[in-house]
């Protein structure tokens, strides 16, 4: 099962638990002062839905796009890659759209942006979360690259009473790969980011940290140190561009010395 805070974002405090002992341990961590709460401490206990992760981006009750994502190793849920559009059949896309609209109607969320997370299981699409807001970075950037729709601009239009235009201007594949360190320590050097950014088809290479930053992994989005975004007319080409760029970005982390040493 999955234990997570009722209120939060970015996978903070979210953990898969396979045994009763793991459930008890993570619950004690969340409620015993180990988690920074944004609201009154309450936890959710959910069945883990096994299957492809999907996200539906909505605006004013209209489906703009469906993306897919991959995570790092359990028990945490740290994003490693995001892509638009998800590789789905027409029937599968229609089911995601239908369930998304049903969620919005049930919750009274007909206006403005919404981001709905799914797992496609053996039972079909299972709703994980319904978020009444735009998805965080880099989803809006990927949607703009994939479909030519700027969700931030279209949201502003809704706010000021103008009509938004959600029609796709083009059809491309856009993907983001997140850069995650494999150890704790002092980040000494980052190399190759400018060379990666110069590759045609690479839209962005962004580092979240600078050299001489201590790295202490927490099992959530704060573990990530950067991302690379690429887009092209085909899925295979985008994947190749992304890998080429990621291979150029290198960093060095020196493990922390013994405490008190």
Q: Which residue stretches match the model-derived regions?
A:
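Gly/Ser/Thr-rich active-site loops/lids in small-molecule metabolic enzymes
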Residues: 143-153
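Short loop segments at secondary-structure junctions
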Residues: 18-22, 61, 124, 163, ...
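Peripheral (often C-terminal) accessory segments that flank ATP-dependent C-N-forming ligase machineries
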Residues: 156-261
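Short, well-ordered beta-strand elements within core beta-sheets of diverse protein domains
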Residues: 15, 47, 144, 225-232
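Short, flexible turn/loop "capping" segments at secondary-structure junctions
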Residues: 5-8, 76-77, 218-223
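Phosphate-binding core of ATP-grasp and ATP-grasp-like enzymes
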Residues: 30-35, 39-42, 47-86, 94-127, ...
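N-terminal beta-alpha lobe that positions the nucleotide/phosphoryl donor
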Residues: 1-2, 8-13, 18-44
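A generic structural signal for well-ordered coil/turn residues at beta-strand boundaries
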Residues: 10-11, 39, 50-52, 62-63, ...
């Amino acid at each position: 099962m999955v234990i997570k805070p009722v209120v939060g974002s970015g996978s903070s405090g979210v953990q898969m638990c396979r045994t009763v002992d793991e459930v008890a341990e993570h619950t004690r961590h969340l409620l015993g002062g180990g988690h920074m709460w944004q609201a009154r401490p309450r936890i959710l206990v959910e069945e883990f839905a096994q299957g492809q992760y999907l996200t539906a981006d909505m605006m004013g009750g209209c489906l703009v796009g469906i993306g897919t994502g991959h995570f790092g190793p359990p028990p945490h849920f740290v994003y490693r890659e995001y892509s638009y559009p998800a590789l789905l059949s027409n029937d599968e896309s229609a089911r995601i759209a239908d369930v998304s609209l049903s969620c919005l109607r049930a919750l009274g969320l007909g206006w403005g942006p919404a981001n709905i997370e799914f797992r496609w299981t053996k039972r079909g699409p299972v709703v994980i979360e319904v978020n009444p807001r735009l998805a965080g970075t880099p989803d809006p950037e990927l949607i703009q690259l994939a479909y030519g729709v700027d969700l931030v601009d279209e949201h502003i239009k809704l706010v000021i009473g103008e009509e938004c235009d959600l029609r796709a201007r083009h059809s491309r594949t856009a993907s983001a790969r997140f850069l995650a360190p494999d150890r704790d320590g002092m980040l000494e050097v980052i190399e190759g980011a400018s060379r990666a950014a110069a590759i045609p088809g690479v839209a962005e290479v962004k580092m979240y940290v600078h050299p001489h930053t201590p790295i202490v992994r927490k099992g959530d989005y704060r573990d990530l140190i950067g991302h690379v975004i690429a887009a092209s007319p085909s899925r295979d080409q985008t994947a190749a561009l992304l890998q080429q760029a990621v291979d150029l970005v290198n960093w060095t982390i020196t493990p922390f010395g013994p405490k008190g040493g």
